[in-house]
UniProtKB/Swiss-Prot annotation:
Name recorded for this polypeptide: Large ribosomal subunit protein bL20c
Single GO cellular component term: ribosome
Primary site of residence: plastid
Pfam families tied to this protein: Ribosomal_L20 (PF00453)
Gene Ontology MF terms: rRNA binding; structural constituent of ribosome
Cellular location(s): Plastid, Chloroplast
GO BP: any one term: translation
Keyword Plastid included in the entry's annotation: yes
Superkingdom of origin organism: Eukaryota
InterPro entries: Ribosomal_bL20, RIBOSOMAL_L20_CS, Ribosomal_protein_bL20_C
Keywords for the protein's UniProt record, in alphabetical order: Chloroplast, Plastid, Ribonucleoprotein, Ribosomal protein, RNA-binding, rRNA-binding
Organism of this sequence: Tupiella akineta (Green alga)
Signal peptide start-end: none
């Protein structure tokens, strides 16, 4: 059986990890083992935070809708409840955008709710 040398494969694998960890602090961007550990942790964080971002944005939208609807003496839960009663289907992202960017349309929406 012939001998297989794998120096190239190992170097390529290590180089790939070090390229991913460019910009990390300390030895995490220079040495392979700490870089590999930081890479694995960074990937775990990114996986977790992709899910967390959805929750954060939803709560941000709700906060924006609540603050905009309180200008009309109506809190968020009452506003959403009345929208559902009137069978108006606008998601929270759109409502938040309307409250910030196009407040005239949001004003009309509030008037239809009353």
């Amino acid at each position: 059986m012939t001998r297989i040398k794998r120096g190239f494969v190992a170097r390529k694998r290590r180089k790939k990890v070090l390229n991913l960890t460019k910009g990390f602090r300390g030895s995490s961007s220079v040495l392979f083992r700490p870089a590999n550990q930081r890479k694995m942790k960074a990937l775990r964080f990114s996986y977790r935070d992709r899910r967390q971002r959805k929750r954060d944005l939803r709560s941000l939208w709700i906060t924006r809708i609540n603050s905009a609807s309180r200008l009309y003496n109506l809190n968020y839960s009452q506003f959403v409840y009345k929208l559902k009663q009137l069978n108006i289907h606008i998601n929270r992202k759109w409502l938040a955008q309307l409250a910030i960017r196009d407040y005239k349309v949001f004003d009309e929406l509030i008037k239809t709710v009353f």
